[in-house]
């Protein structure tokens, strides 16, 4: 999503809640940023959809309820009660709790449920230690900003009563008495109104603006010089029509030399008068020098006292306002309009649209709806915007720039196949007799659309020179047919107000000349809410009295936008609202009006007007047909009237039930050709036989209230509003059906494509210009219509259409929420499918590795009956392979964790019943079982290799010790003639070997070695190594026994004897004889003496020690003997010692261990002769059976 468009949408929503936004923006945006970081993790789109849109609805509801108590008043602070100028009353984020004191509280809008918010009251708890949060029930929203509401809160509150409300501004947090907040200030509190005579002789009330310069009367002819700005007050009603939407227009600082107007409610723009409410000027605007730039706003009241009997209008009078504001860029959300170079007018900027007229011969002002970054090259600037109204003006330029963030190519959803087009109109210059219209055509689905720059270059600019920065808003989907100024498509864009849109884009509006010389707004049909059906054209005015061509009436229901403004207001035909005695609507046609002679009053135009009037009544009334009353009492013949009636009856035979001619039949002789029943009435008394007198309007001398100008203005605003609502409803309904179709079949790619398409569809719908306009200003338009309908309550047609508008508005509002819900559900399911697909792909990758490369490596590196060197090589390779196994295992565990989290999240969202999720759950369980089994197999194989490697090392160590013992025995046998003395080298070597036998090769290590062999996964693996080690151990015992036989006094230290004794199993109750123990005690003392002598003979450098071991490893020189003498065994001096040695070298026969036995511990020697490796440190156990 475009970040700039998202920012624009958020700022637009905040600006509507907290006007003036340039004053409240620092505070409000600070709260928004805190809320984004704390609750939405910086996700602006979720903040907009889940919080800001519901919060905007709630705040508007509270504001409307609060303002409804003060009707007929104009609020000084337009943001009341949500804010007071720059002080924010209703907060979006929590305040610092340390700022709360007893009696203080503040109001905050908080998230409640999914895409729902509620308002809470926060204050200190009774113990003053924490912040107490009190949700405000929805039923109390209409009473919040009243003193009674706080009294009710205090009655239920324990502790000190609440009386101060915390408000936030750029200067900090300030407590304000609640009574001050609930008592709004009004513009009525001002000096008396000054009346200044106007050029028409009427008087106009003028506010005293407290400016430094005296007031100057306005000169009606001075259009280009210094003008005036003032507040015009409605004399008839004594108020501006803005019951529900206060703060109609305010003055805000603009760039240097400009004055910016802005409206936050358009309810005051009823057609009974044109008003500009000028509120308090900032201090910097007062007392400026006369040379400062000025802003001129001219308003002309078109209707006279006779046309508007209930409103006394007057031209705008005022004075020049000097501007001395600081230079700088306008605040966010402000729409600026600038004068092109050489236009001779001062620039102005405005944030609302309002009609501005001025009567002048040969030249009229043009109303230009403001767009973002729109230059308005007109003589008179329109500094305000609001409800768009039809005006009587000359055609003029309407040039717009492409809205920010609009993509070059955008596909719009449409309820049905249609095309939309919009002419781009441009002014040819001040001297041209008529506006020259140039159009650019683009193709929908074929060819290439023209760029906005091309459109700018190809369109004429004001005064022959382009305005700086002037561009058109040109959408690629538009298809613009060739339209002449006389046949320009008449479309009408209406302001709307509702939820904040996703994209703050506006429909492109332009001026098209009407057939009667007036100017009507045209809306580019770039979206599905385009007002005009495709291919619709209306011919220009034909000759008066000409025949009616039926093909001109062959289109669908006529629209009021297609009718000429002068024809509507002429009064030649009207629907006063009365009913005859049968209940048929009364259609009054007057032949006495001078408009029949006008060139724009053609037969086709009259037929179109009558056709439209026949479509206005309610459906049940139209079924009865209309009663047409032709007032021809003055006897004027109108032959075109009969042709018009024939035309509408040819298209809709049941539209006219009966025709009553009030006057002489000779006045309209062709009535007999009409298919409907025709009756001639010569007097009003005869008319009362058909229509009750109370249902007759004033034109037929009846009391029924009817004001034609008000009726026309009401339907000019209502009909386009209804059209836009119907088209928006169709658009939303089609979108909802599209989202409710369900997920398409297919894999991850199809789900990804559908996900992207759904997001684009949702984005396109929410960016639709018509829907955006309804969201922005629909509520305001509806409120304005309700206000204007108060004077037409007697007309049932007005009541029924207003009820339909309210119902359609609520329907669109509900459909918008349904669309968001359906979109969220579909997007959630599609995102789930995509995530599941990615997880399944990753799981398959791990599974394929285990089934392929992993299994092959396990088989290739399996332990076999090989030599020690091969085992060491295989073990090293397997260690590298096991690193890959561990990495795959960790990845598999991470995937399983993600799957579990995804399942838990969907279970919390109620999506556990989805078939994709159920199938993935079974896949994930099978994968986890395979992963565990594979990892356990690798662990077991790694353990087997390590055990086998340790067995080979232990066997090799024992073989080396066996060779040492053989060497010792050989040396002893060679020197048997000379008996070894207790202190010679051979004796010491024997002493060391006996010590090693007792420590390094004891019985427990041999038993542990046997258990390790039994623990291997393959039967018979390592058995040969074990048997060889056992054989070497027995041979070592035999060799050492023979070596002891050559020693005259083989004394062994008592400590070594104890170790050897503990190393072999001793039968229960068996022990050494007492005399033997005493002998070994003496031997221990001799051994210690020998050790002392041995240690004293060693040199510090170790040189003598190395020579001694060299002698021990080689036989003594001169030592020799016969083989027989070697084989002979010398007699031991003591039989007790012989029994002890026999017990020392006796080998316990170990039972064979079963294959299922597992080692429990022990230690054996590793490589070398001095180091030991604990068996408990080796991985002889397997991983758990399950994860």
UniProtKB/Swiss-Prot annotation:
Family matches, as InterPro entries: Rho_GEF_signaling-related (IPR052231)
Listed name of the protein: Uncharacterized protein KIAA1755 homolog
Species in which this protein is naturally found: Mus musculus (Mouse)
Chain positions covered by the region annotation Disordered: 302-405, 419-451, 511-551, 1095-1134, 1148-1187
Biased composition (Basic residues): 352-361
Polar residues composition-biased segments: 1096-1107
Positions in coiled-coil regions: none
Low complexity bias: start-end ranges: 321-333, 422-435, 517-534, 1160-1174
């Amino acid at each position: 999503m475009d970040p700039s468009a998202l920012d624009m949408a958020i700022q637009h929503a905040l600006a509507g809640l907290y006007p003036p936004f340039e004053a409240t923006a620092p505070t409000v945006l600070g709260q928004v940023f805190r809320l984004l970081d704390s609750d939405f993790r910086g996700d602006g789109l979720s903040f907009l959809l889940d919080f800001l849109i519901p919060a905007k609805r709630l705040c508007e509801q509270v504001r409307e309820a609060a303002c409804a108590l003060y009707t007929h008043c104009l609020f000084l602070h337009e943001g009341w009660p949500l804010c007071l100028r720059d002080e924010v009353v209703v907060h979006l984020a929590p305040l610092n709790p340390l700022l709360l004191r007893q009696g203080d509280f503040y109001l905050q809008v908080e998230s409640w449920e999914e895409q729902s918010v509620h308002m809470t009251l926060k204050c200190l708890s009774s113990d003053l230690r924490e912040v107490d949060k009190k949700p405000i029930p929805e039923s109390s929203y209409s009473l919040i900003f009243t003193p009674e509401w706080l009294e009710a809160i205090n009655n239920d509150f324990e502790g000190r009563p609440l009386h101060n409300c915390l408000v936030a501004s750029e200067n900090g947090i300030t407590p304000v008495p609640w009574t001050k907040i609930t008592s709004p200030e009004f513009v009525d509190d001002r000096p008396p109104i000054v009346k200044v005579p106007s050029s028409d002789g009427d008087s106009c009330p003028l506010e005293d603006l407290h400016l430094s310069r005296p007031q100057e009367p306005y000169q009606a002819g001075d259009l280009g010089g210094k003008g005036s700005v003032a507040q015009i007050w409605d004399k008839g009603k004594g108020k501006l029509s803005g019951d529900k939407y206060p703060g109609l227009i305010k003055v805000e600082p603009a760039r240097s030399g400009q004055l910016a107007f802005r409206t936050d409610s358009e309810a005051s723009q009823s057609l009974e008068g044109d008003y500009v409410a000028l509120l308090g000027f900032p201090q910097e605007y007062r007392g400026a020098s006369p040379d400062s730039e000025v802003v001129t706003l001219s308003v002309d009241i078109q209707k006279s006292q006779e046309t508007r009997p209930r409103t006394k209008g007057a031209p705008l009078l005022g004075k020049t306002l000097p501007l001395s504001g600081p230079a700088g860029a306008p605040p966010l959300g402000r729409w600026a309009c600038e004068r092109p170079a050489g236009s001779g007018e001062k620039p102005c900027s405005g944030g609302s649209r309002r009609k501005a007229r001025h009567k002048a011969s040969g030249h009229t002002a043009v109303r230009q709806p403001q767009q973002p970054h729109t230059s308005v090259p007109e003589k008179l600037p329109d500094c305000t915007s609001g409800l768009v109204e039809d005006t009587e003006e000359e055609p003029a330029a309407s040039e717009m720039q492409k809205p920010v963030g609009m993509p070059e190519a955008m596909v719009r959803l449409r309820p049905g196949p249609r095309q939309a087009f919009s002419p781009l109109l441009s002014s040819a210059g001040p001297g041209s007799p008529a506006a020259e219209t140039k159009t650019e055509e683009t193709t929908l689905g074929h060819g290439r659309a023209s760029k906005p720059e091309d459109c700018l270059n190809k369109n004429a600019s004001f005064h022959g020179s382009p305005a700086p920065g002037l561009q058109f808003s040109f959408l690629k989907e538009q298809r613009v047919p060739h339209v002449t100024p006389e046949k320009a498509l008449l479309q009408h864009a209406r302001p709307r107000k509702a939820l904040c849109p996703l994209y703050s884009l506006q429909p492109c509006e332009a001026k098209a000349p009407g057939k009667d010389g007036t100017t009507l707004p045209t809306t580019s049909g770039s979206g599905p809410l385009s007002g005009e059906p495709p291919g619709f054209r209306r011919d220009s005015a034909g000759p008066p009295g000409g025949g009616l061509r039926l093909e001109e009436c062959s289109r669908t229901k006529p629209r009021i936008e297609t009718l000429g403004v002068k024809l509507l207001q002429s009064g030649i035909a009207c629907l006063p609202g009365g009913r005859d005695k049968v209940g048929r609507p009364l259609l009054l046609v007057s032949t006495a009006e001078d408009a029949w002679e006008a060139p724009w009053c053609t037969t086709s135009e009259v037929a179109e007007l009558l056709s439209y009037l026949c479509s206005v009544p309610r459906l049940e009334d139209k079924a009865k047909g209309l009663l047409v009353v032709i007032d021809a009492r003055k006897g004027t013949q109108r032959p075109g009237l009969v042709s018009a009636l024939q035309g509408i009856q040819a298209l809709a035979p049941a539209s006219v039930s009966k025709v009553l001619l009030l006057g002489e039949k000779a006045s309209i002789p062709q009535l007999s050709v009409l298919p409907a029943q025709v009756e001639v009435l010569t007097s009003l008394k005869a008319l009362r036989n058909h229509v009750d007198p109370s249902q007759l309007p004033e034109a037929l001398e009846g009391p029924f209230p009817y004001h034609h100008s008000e009726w026309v203005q009401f339907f000019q605003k209502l009909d386009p509003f209804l059209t836009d609502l119907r088209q928006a409803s169709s658009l939303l309904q089609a979108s909802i059906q599209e989202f409710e179709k369900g997920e398409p079949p297919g894999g991850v790619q199809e789900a990804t494509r559908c996900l992207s398409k759904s997001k684009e569809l949702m984005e396109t719908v929410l960016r639709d210009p018509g829907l955006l306009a309804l969201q922005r200003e629909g509520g305001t338009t509806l409120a304005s219509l309700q206000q204007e309908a108060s004077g037409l309550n007697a007309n049932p047609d007005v009541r029924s259409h207003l009820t339909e508008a309210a119902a359609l508005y609520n329907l669109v509002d509900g459909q918008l929420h349904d669309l968001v819900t359906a979109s969220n559900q579909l997007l959630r399911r599609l995102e789930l499918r995509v995530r599941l697909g990615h997880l399944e792909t990753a799981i398959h990758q791990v599974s394929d590795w285990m089934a392929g490369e992993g299994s092959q490596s396990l088989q290739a590196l399996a332990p076999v009956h090989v030599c020690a060197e091969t085992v060491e090589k295989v073990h090293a390779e397997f260690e590298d392979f096991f690193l890959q196994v561990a990495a795959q295992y960790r990845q598999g565990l991470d995937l399983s964790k993600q799957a579990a989290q995804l399942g838990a999240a969907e279970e919390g969202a109620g999506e556990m019943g989805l078939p994709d999720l159920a199938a993935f759950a079974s896949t994930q369980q099978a994968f986890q079982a395979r992963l565990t089994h594979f990892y356990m197999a690798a662990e077991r194989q790694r353990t087997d290799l390590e055990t086998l490697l340790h067995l080979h090392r232990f066997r090799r160590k024992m073989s080396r010790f066996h060779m040492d013992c053989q060497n010792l025995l050989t040396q002893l046998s060679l020197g048997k003639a000379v008996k070894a003395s207790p202190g010679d080298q051979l004796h010491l070597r024997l002493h060391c070997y006996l010590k090693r036998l007792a420590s390094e090769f004891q019985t427990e290590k041999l038993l542990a070695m046997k258990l390790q062999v039994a623990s291997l996964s393959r039967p018979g693996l390592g058995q040969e190594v074990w048997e060889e080690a056992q054989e070497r151990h027995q041979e070592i015992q035999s060799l050492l026994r023979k070596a002891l036989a050559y020693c005259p006094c083989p004394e062994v230290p008592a400590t070594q004897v104890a170790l050897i004794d503990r190393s072999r199993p001793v039968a229960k109750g068996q022990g050494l004889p007492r005399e033997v123990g005493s002998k070994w005690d003496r031997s221990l003392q001799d051994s210690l003496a020998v050790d002392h002598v041995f240690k004293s003979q060693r040199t510090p450098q170790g040189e003598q020690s190395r020579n001694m071991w060299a002698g021990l490893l080689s036989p003594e020189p001169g030592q020799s003997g016969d083989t027989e003498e070697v084989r002979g065994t010398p007699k031991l001096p003591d039989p007790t010692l012989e029994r002890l040695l026999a017990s020392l070298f006796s080998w316990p026969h170990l039972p064979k261990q079963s294959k299922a036995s597992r080692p429990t511990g022990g230690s054996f020697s590793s490589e070398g002769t001095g180091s030991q490796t604990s068996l408990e440190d080796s991985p002889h156990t397997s991983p758990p059976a399950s994860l």
